[in-house]
């Protein structure tokens, strides 16, 4: 993700000029919540490694370190001030505190998976860290899944550009990864929607059963 004025030519120049630093800070800023096209810069780093301008290991380490640092920043922002801010926003939109507490509980149950797999989903990679902080996931647990997810994501992303960059253009690689990331987001939204529909129907069914039993003559 990123602002439109970050043209591919500009990003390529940044990657060539600053190398590992561009990869590190690009993905760190994106994971911290700033809309910098960090994933694209990481792909460019892998592409440059494939052409011999950078080393594969250096790009991989920079991507992992940047992703872990960025998500950790988001975690602490969420932990220190995220819940009060979210509570005030809920009051502004007349969202009951009970609903907010339920959402917090649900995320705390599935937060580890969100932190690990959120790397591969556009938007979720930005919000997983702050949400983990808001629900007060233990930092040790968060860091474990953060490092694990960052390592898998970086290995796939850098390797994809490193190897495929020898046979296809970097523009095509970026297009493929962007499409996959949006598809993953759509899949997550779809699954969440199905869950809430199922939960709603189950609640209505239980209410109907209770009403039927209550209406029976004693």
Curated annotation (Swiss-Prot):
Asked if the Swiss-Prot or TrEMBL record annotates the protein with the keyword Endoplasmic reticulum, the reply is no
Q: Which UniProt keywords apply?
A: Cell membrane, Membrane, Transmembrane, Transmembrane helix
Q: How does it sit in the membrane?
A: Multi-pass membrane protein
The cross-references to Pfam families, in alphabetical order and at most eight, read: VTT_dom
* InterPro entries in alphabetical order: DedA_domain (IPR051311), VTT_dom (IPR032816)
Localisation per UniProt entry? Cell membrane
The superkingdom of the source organism is Bacteria
Report the GO terms under cellular component. plasma membrane
- Transmembrane segments in this chain: where? 27-49, 57-77, 115-135, 142-162, 180-200
The reply on keyword Chloroplast is no
**PANTHER family xref list:** ALKALINE PHOSPHATASE LIKE PROTEIN, UNDECAPRENYL PHOSPHATE TRANSPORTER A
Family designation: Belongs to the DedA family.
Q: What is this protein called?
A: Uncharacterized membrane protein slr0232
């Amino acid at each position: 993700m990123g602002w439109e004025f970050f043209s591919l030519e500009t990003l390529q120049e940044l990657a060539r000029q600053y190398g590992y630093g561009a990869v590190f800070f690009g993905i760190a800023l994106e994971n911290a919540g700033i809309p910098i096209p960090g994933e694209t810069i990481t792909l460019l780093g892998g592409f440059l490694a494939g052409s011999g301008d950078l080393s594969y290991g250096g790009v991989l380490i920079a991507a992992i370190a940047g992703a872990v640092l960025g998500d950790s920043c988001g975690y602490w922002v969420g932990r220190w001030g995220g819940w009060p801010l979210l509570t005030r926003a809920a009051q502004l939109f007349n969202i009951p505190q009970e609903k907010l507490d339920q959402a917090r509980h649900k995320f705390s149950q599935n937060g580890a998976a969100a932190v690990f797999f959120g790397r591969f989903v556009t938007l979720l990679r930005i919000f997983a860290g702050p949400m983990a902080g808001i629900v007060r996931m233990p930092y040790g647990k968060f860091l474990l899944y953060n490092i694990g997810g960052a390592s898998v994501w970086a290995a796939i992303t850098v390797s994809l550009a490193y190897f495929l960059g020898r046979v296809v253009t970097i523009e095509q690689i970026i297009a493929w990864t962007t499409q996959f990331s949006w598809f993953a987001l759509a899949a997550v939204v779809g699954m969440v929607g199905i869950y809430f529909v199922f939960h709603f129907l189950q609640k209505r069914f239980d209410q109907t059963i209770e009403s039927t039993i209550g209406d029976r003559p004693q």
